[in-house]
């Protein structure tokens, strides 16, 4: 796939291409395509790669210069993500802070918070984890129970968070807490920034189905953070949290979809090797897999075109995640079927090849970031205007 | 990157939608569906005269407006939404395209202005008993005589062949596939038999030629590449029509799901229905990407990309429209199963679109071949 984003960004693109050609070498080049939004593979190499990117000032391309970014526009951000994915560079270890927390702080944070937290993110000096989900609050995030109480100039936080991606690496967490004990649901919640290096915070890895200690559970017992660590207003945490989840600028889908395209191409190669293309049923599913990735591409391009021309993204932006996650899973199932018995054999210590890992991890894509069922509720209620289910 | 619509294109959509709301509402669709000719010449002339829809993407030198395929796709999408009856697809997506793609400047100059002005209804006669849309399916023969070329044989499933003033006929000659023009009125040896159709909003005809005189377009035996390209363009335009039809079916389902109550609450509050509607939207938006991707490819003009995008669009949009139209009936329950309710009109249109230019399986195979799979 070759896309030209126009003359305005050509110099920028060329600079980036040259830089990638010079720096994506050696160990970094060996880890092309490694990692993913919930894939902790080769963590140390990826972290080193993030430092390399940081030294080249390629992190925070769209962030203001005063916080260490380049202060460029959405188009440059898109070009960056596209060229980055095209070069198949390792998946950034710091992506959580770059894609979620950073934009949230830029939008809702105080000046002091921006000054304090944004530069270290771009310098890969501090890593972040998202502490939203709890054992009792998953899809129904508004039922969080982790409590935070004000004590002098501090907040004291107790409760349990779970499924925190890359939690074991986190220096800081952004946590959704209940600050008004009398409150129910969306009211009385507050978003707090909390350092992990303290006695009240215990983080235990959870092994995921691919055998990786990727996400974590977080136990908070009288954990402390400063009074100035509230993002947005006290009691308005739901709004702040939703703003984070609403930060979908279309830039994240593009690299994901290029990865899917690569997988589809490799699927076709595999099918050819196995002689599977002569089987009409398999052949049909293979073509359909290819169709899906091509449709994802056009859908993303439609959204990007709308964003860059200042239009409101259309309905496709609300259905893109549901489509991509379900179709990517189908692609994984098909790839595993084509791989046959050899695909059933893993390496030492449950070492997985790219295909096996991608297949297993694709099972999470319909769960995190709003499960497929929740996506359908949102599409139905917020986009199509269908009535909500009555609450019991 | 220009994968979005301009303000002018939004305006075009608005104008066409309000025109069709007036001239192709449900009552009119039902009237034309029940009518053997299925065509309103007054509306046809207005489409040309007021809006220039027949010549929208035809270059100005042939009396058109020289707009792009994205613009034309907008019209087809709206036509699909309104279940427009009549020979618009046959004339514009098939016949005008075939003329633009054949290597015969004189024919273009002679024949296209009639189409763009709304005087001529035209169609492409390609399929025969086998229903095949490929080169091998063309058996009808043309023979050169002292008085010029003559056609002998039969074409069938010809869209709007009963009305067409101008028939473009694909035929086999000693050196291959050639394209011919027949002025249908009083053509000697031509018999036209309208075929009763499952989808009454799109008429089909059987055409029999017995030594019918015809005008050869372009050089003998060289027509197939232009025809293949015509079918690619028509595939994309049909995909746009399918997206429009599917959108209308979803709108109907959603509207009903908000109104109809069972167990004391609107059925749209049940996840079984709500999630079905969400899946319909996802299907439609994906189909939209498939169709729009094809339209953008047509305007960009890269032939390989056009061939791929067209086959993809037909495969995906055919299946999407059929599924959504079926789900719309399901959401409506018993009322959706009646002749009175319009839901079946969309299902039947979906089924006729699905085979109009070859089935999804056929297009999937075309796509595979074009991708080298
Ligand atoms: C790999 C991975 C990484 C994650 N990373 C993070 C992270 O960094 N930080 C964080 O805070 N969280 C994270 N999560 C958590 C994620 O947000 C939750 O798993 C998700 O919100 C679903 O919640 P749950 O697991 O409690 O499932 P539940 O909400 O209990 O859902 C179980 C099933 O019930 C369905 N269901 C629930 N409610 C409804 C409804 N109203 N209608 C229909 N069906 C319904 C769901 O769709 C699902 O199929 C991660 C999850 C995964 C898998």
Regions found by a protein language model. Name each.
Chain B
Residues 86-106:
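N-terminal glycine-rich flavin-associated loop
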Residues 118-129:
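A short, Trp-centered hydrophobic/proline-enriched beta-strand micro-motif
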Residues 125, 152-191:
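A short core secondary-structure module
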């Amino acid at each position: 796939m070759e896309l030209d984003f126009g003359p305005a960004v050509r110099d920028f693109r060329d600079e980036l291409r040259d830089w990638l050609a010079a720096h994506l070498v050696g160990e970094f080049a060996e880890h092309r395509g490694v990692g993913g939004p919930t894939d902790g593979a080769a963590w140390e190499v990826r972290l080193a790669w993030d430092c390399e990117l940081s030294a080249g000032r390629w992190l925070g391309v769209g962030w203001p210069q005063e916080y260490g970014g380049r202060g460029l526009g959405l188009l440059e951000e898109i070009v960056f993500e596209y060229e980055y994915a095209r070069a198949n560079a390792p998946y950034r270890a710091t992506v959580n802070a770059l894609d979620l927390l950073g934009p949230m702080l830029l939008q809702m944070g105080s000046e002091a918070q921006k000054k304090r937290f944004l530069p270290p993110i771009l310098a890969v000096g501090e890593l972040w984890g998202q502490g939203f989900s709890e054992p009792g609050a998953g899809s129904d995030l508004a039922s969080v129970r982790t409590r935070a109480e004000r004590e002098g100039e501090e907040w004291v936080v107790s409760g349990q968070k779970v499924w925190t991606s890359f939690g074991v690496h986190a220096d800081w967490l952004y946590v959704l807490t209940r600050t008004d004990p009398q409150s129910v649901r969306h009211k009385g919640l507050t978003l707090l920034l909390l350092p992990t290096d303290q006695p009240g915070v215990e983080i235990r890895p959870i092994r995921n189905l691919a055998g990786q200690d990727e996400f974590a559970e977080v136990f908070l017992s009288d954990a402390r953070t400063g009074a100035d660590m509230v993002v947005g207003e006290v009691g308005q945490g739901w709004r702040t949290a939703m703003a984070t989840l609403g930060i979908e600028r279309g830039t994240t889908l593009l690299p994901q979809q290029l990865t899917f395209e690569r997988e589809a191409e490799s699927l076709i190669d595999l099918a050819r090797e196995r002689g599977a293309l002569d089987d009409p049923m398999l052949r049909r599913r293979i073509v359909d897999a290819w169709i899906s990735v091509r449709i994802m591409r056009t859908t993303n391009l439609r959204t990007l075109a709308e964003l860059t021309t200042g239009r409101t993204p259309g309905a496709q932006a609300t259905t893109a995640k549901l489509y991509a996650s379900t179709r990517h899973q189908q692609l994984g199932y098909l790839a595993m079927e084509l791989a046959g018995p050899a695909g059933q054999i893993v390496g030492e210590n449950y070492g997985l090849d790219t295909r096996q890992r991608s297949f297993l991890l694709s099972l999470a894509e319909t769960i995190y970031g709003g499960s497929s069922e929740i996506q359908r509720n949102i599409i139905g209620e917020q986009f199509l205007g269908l009535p909500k289910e009555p609450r019991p | 990157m220009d994968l979005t619509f301009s303000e002018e294109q939004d305006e075009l959509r608005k104008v066409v939608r309000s025109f069709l709301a007036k001239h192709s509402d449900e009552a009119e669709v039902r009237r034309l569906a029940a009518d053997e000719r299925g065509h309103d010449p007054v509306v046809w002339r207005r489409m040309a005269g007021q809006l220039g829809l027949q010549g929208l993407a035809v270059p100005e030198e042939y009396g058109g407006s020289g707009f792009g395929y994205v613009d034309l796709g907008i019209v087809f999408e709206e036509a699909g939404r309104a279940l427009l009856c009549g020979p618009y697809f046959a004339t514009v997506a098939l016949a005008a395209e075939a003329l633009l793609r054949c290597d015969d400047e004189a024919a273009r100059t002679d024949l296209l202005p009639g189409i763009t002005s709304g005087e001529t209804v035209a169609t492409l006669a390609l399929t025969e008993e086998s229903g095949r849309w490929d080169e091998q399916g063309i058996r009808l023969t043309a023979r050169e005589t002292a008085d010029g070329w003559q056609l002998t044989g039969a074409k069938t499933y010809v869209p709007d062949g009963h009305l067409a003033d101008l028939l473009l006929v694909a035929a086999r000659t000693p050196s291959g596939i050639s394209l011919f023009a027949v002025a249908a009125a009083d053509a000697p040896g031509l018999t036209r038999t309208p075929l009763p159709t499952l989808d009454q909003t799109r008429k089909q005809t059987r055409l029999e030629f017995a030594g019918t005189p015809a005008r050869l377009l372009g050089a003998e035996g060289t027509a197939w590449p232009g025809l293949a390209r015509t079918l690619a363009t028509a595939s994309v335009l049909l995909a746009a029509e399918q997206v429009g039809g599917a959108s209308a079916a979803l709108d109907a389902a959603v509207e009903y799901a908000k109104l109809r109550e069972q167990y004391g609450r609107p059925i749209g509050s049940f996840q079984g229905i709500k999630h079905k509607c969400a899946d319909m939207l996802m299907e439609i938006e994906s189909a939209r990407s498939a169709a729009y991707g094809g339209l953008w490819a047509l305007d960009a003009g890269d032939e390989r990309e056009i061939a791929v995008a067209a086959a993809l669009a037909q495969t995906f949009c055919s299946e999407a429209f059929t599924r959504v139209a079926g789900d719309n009936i399901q959401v409506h329950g018993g009322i959706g199963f009646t002749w009175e309710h319009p839901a079946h009109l969309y299902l039947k249109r979906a089924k006729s679109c699905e085979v109009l230019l070859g089935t999804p399986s056929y297009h999937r195979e075309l796509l595979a071949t074009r991708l080298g799979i």
